[in-house]
């Protein structure tokens, strides 16, 4: 069985209890797939507090590859795979530029998105968003 959470985890409260529930719902060979924004990405670092994927107050939690791996481990999961979502950087960068009310937000966002995409090619853990595949510990 599989549970998928596409840009959901950052909205959930209470977080620890949710992870415990997810673990209890999965069978021994169950898989949890979660996609979340990566606050250690190139675009997050470039924009700082203005990064649109912080999305306060809707995003209650912000994850790095290390923090989500530790969270999963704390609740009985092993990180099996990690995949970048490099194209999220284009949308997030354009939205950030728009929210900052800067001139030419589309063009500026595309430039930053392109730079972020190249950074993610070299260092996948710097992708704007990441997909994590967790398996239950045995």
Map each language-model feature to its residues.
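Generic, low-specificity signal for short hydrophobic/alpha-helical stretches with a mild N-terminal bias
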Residues: 4, 50-54, 112, 116
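Generic structural signal for short, flexible, solvent-exposed coil/loop and linker residues
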Residues: 36, 49-57, 121-123
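Short glycine/proline- and charge-enriched loop/turn segments
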Residues: 47-56, 95-102
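Residue-level detector of anion-binding/catalytic polar loops
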Residues: 78
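A C-terminal cap/extension of S-adenosyl-L-methionine-dependent methyltransferases
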Residues: 81-138
